Structure formats: structure tokens, C-alpha cells
Amino acid sequence: MINSRLAVAIHILSLISMDEKTSSEIIADSVNTNPVVVRRMISLLKKADILTSRAGVPGASLKKDPADISLLEVYRAVQKQEELFAVHENPNPKCPVGKKIQNALDETFESVQRAMENELASKSLKDVMNHLF
């Protein structure tokens, strides 16, 4: 299931692209969250090779131009790799609907997941930033 991680990560990356010396406290104030949440998110973005930082130097910087960072890349960096939709796991096998619901929905849900990922892949951080500035 999607939560707000993708939106928060894009928010963080947009701020960092404007000013690489922006602290996690300033970012947290903009996102309206705790600086610890921001630092965790920044850590995930570093592991995904989207951000970099240097010891002793405040802030972080983008490793690539915003136009070269797809929203899918950001999504995969911060979102657990699970299906977008979940089907309840233990429907009643004696029920005519319960015994077939998972198979009936699998193809549709997988198709929607692919469509979402394709759309995210077609959009960049720069595309979002163009709407911001």
C-alpha cells in the first residue's frame, strides 16, 4: 500500500536541489515532520544512489540532475517493495466468491501496478519541480 513516503521524498529532494546546505531541521519544518524522519528518508535516498553527502559538510546533494531522476527511482528507494493492492489472505474457500476472489483480482491489480510504475518512470523530479517554481 502506498503511504506518504514518495511525496515526502520528492519534497526533500526538491528542497535539497534548491540548496544543498539545507539541514534536516529546515527540511523537517517544511515537510512538517520530525527531523529524524527526514534523516531516515535521506539515508534511504543515499542508499539508492540518489543523494550524496560528505562527512563534516552539512547537507546533501543530488547525484544526478533532477531531469535524470525518475519518480519510479524515488518510489523504489523509499517504498517497501510490495504490491500496490492487497487481497485479503484467507477468504472462505467454501464461498463461491471467496474461493475465486484472489485469482479474479490478481491480473487487474498487477496491470494497475504496472501502469502506475510506467507513469512514475515517465516523470522526473524536474517535472515536479517545474510545477513548484
Swiss-Prot record:
GO terms for biological process: regulation of DNA-templated transcription. Gene3D superfamilies: Winged helix-like DNA-binding domain superfamily/Winged helix DNA-binding domain. Transmembrane segments: none annotated. Residues 24-47 bind DNA. GO terms for molecular function: DNA binding; DNA-binding transcription factor activity. Residues 1-130 form the HTH rrf2-type domain. It comes from the Bacteria. Signal peptide: none annotated. Keywords: DNA-binding, Transcription, Transcription regulation. InterPro entries: Tscrpt_reg_Rrf2 (IPR000944), WH-like_DNA-bd_sf (IPR036388), WH_DNA-bd_sf (IPR036390). The keyword Transferase does not apply. GO terms for cellular component: cytosol. PANTHER family: HTH-TYPE TRANSCRIPTIONAL REGULATOR YWGB-RELATED, WINGED HELIX-TURN-HELIX TRANSCRIPTIONAL REGULATOR, RRF2 FAMILY. This is Putative HTH-type transcriptional regulator YwnA.
